[in-house]
Swiss-Prot record:
Predominantly expressed in spleen, with highest levels on selected populations of macrophages, including red pulp macrophages, and on subsets of dendritic cells (DC), mostly on CD8alpha(+) DC (at protein level). Also expressed on blood and spleen Ly6C(low) monocytes (at protein level). Not expressed on lymphocytes or granulocytes (at protein level). The keyword Transmembrane helix applies. It is found in: Cell membrane. Residues 222-263 are cytoplasmic. This is Trem-like transcript 4 protein. Residues 29-132 form the Ig-like V-type domain. The cytoplasmic tail appears to be dispensable for TLR7-mediated signaling. Residues 168-191 are annotated as: Disordered. It is a single-pass type I membrane protein. Positively regulates Toll-like receptor signaling via TLR7, TLR9 and TLR13 in neutrophils and splenic macrophages. Regulates TLR7 signaling by controlling ligand-induced recruitment of TLR7 from the endoplasmic reticulum to endosomes and lysosomes. Positively regulates Toll-like receptor TLR9-induced production of inflammatory cytokines but is dispensable for IFNB1 production. Involved in the anti-viral response to several viruses including influenza virus, vesicular stomatitis virus and cytomegalovirus.
Length: 263
């Protein structure tokens, strides 16, 4: 019986594992890749996607300005042609299935969350492929900027794409996010929430539900076992009157035999 209960306890744990494996978009899309640079350095990012033999889809580099929207920094106009906006450059190769973004002469004001992905002008929507957290630190005052050793790139991770609404630098209309929200490190919005905290809360709630389900299953099986034991005891007790009647009959016959022997 104990082994049976332990097997039931494993069911919610297996469900949690399957949810994390089968639905990476739910858990993984809120995780950001943190990249560190110093003032004056450059940043290069590559975003990969599945090549498609359809009409060309624009690609963009988008900076988060609030938990519910982002502003496009630089956007492609056609394949295999570099597009430049200030210190930002983007270049796309649809046949290879990737596009590169370069940011030069970084300043501390460039510290923010950035998204890269396909851009759909009619919907004003970006399908986010990567979520980059850029942290630009001041250069050491004792060393010239050209002697600063470049910091290593973060390991590239492909996330489950999810769409968000966006605005261009000229547009000021507020747009709501259509997917999972992300915070902007440089944003002063009081409603901002850490993605890591949101993930922890989601995991905690899911594990709490799994634990409650486990307790319910154990109690249900325990009550069922108690019911079966009660029925078995009732059946055994119901047989006792027949046994007592049999004993009375045997006792009665023995009495007659004793009287016969006496006569």
């Amino acid at each position: 019986m104990a082994w049976r209960y332990s097997q039931l306890l494993l069911v919610p744990v297996q469900l949690v594992f399957l949810a994390s494996v089968c639905c990476p978009g739910v858990w993984g899309s809120t995780v950001s890749e943190e990249l560190h640079r110093m003032v004056g350095q450059s940043l290069s990012v590559q975003c990969q996607y599945k090549p498609k033999e359809e009409s060309y889809v624009l690609k963009t580099w988008c900076r988060q300005t609030a938990p519910s929207k982002c502003t496009r920094v630089v956007t492609t106009s056609e394949p295999r042609k570099a597009a430049r906006e200030l210190q930002h450059t983007i270049w796309d190769d649809p046949e290879a299935g990737f596009f590169n973004i370069t940011m030069t002469q970084l300043t501390e004001d460039d510290s923010a969350f950035y998204w890269c992905g396909p851009y759909y002008p009619s919907l004003r929507e970006v399908t986010v492929l990567r979520n980059i957290s850029l942290v630009v630190s001041p250069a050491p005052s004792t060393l010239p900027s050209q002697t600063i050793a470049p910091l290593p790139e973060s390991t590239a991770t492909i996330f489950m794409p999810f769409p968000v609404l966006t605005t261009s630098p000229e547009e000021t209309t507020d747009s709501s996010i259509n997917g999972t929200g992300h915070r902007n490190q440089s944003s002063s919005s009081p409603g901002w929430t850490s993605p890591g905290l949101l993930v922890s809360v989601q995991y905690g709630l899911l594990l709490l539900k799994a634990l409650m389900l486990s307790v319910f299953c154990v109690l249900l099986c325990w009550r069922s076992g108690q019911g079966r034991e009660y029925m078995a005891e009732t059946m055994e007790l119901s047989k006792l009157p027949h046994i007592s009647k049999s004993l009375d009959t045997v006792s009665h016959i023995s009495g007659y035999e004793k009287k016969a022997n006496w006569y």
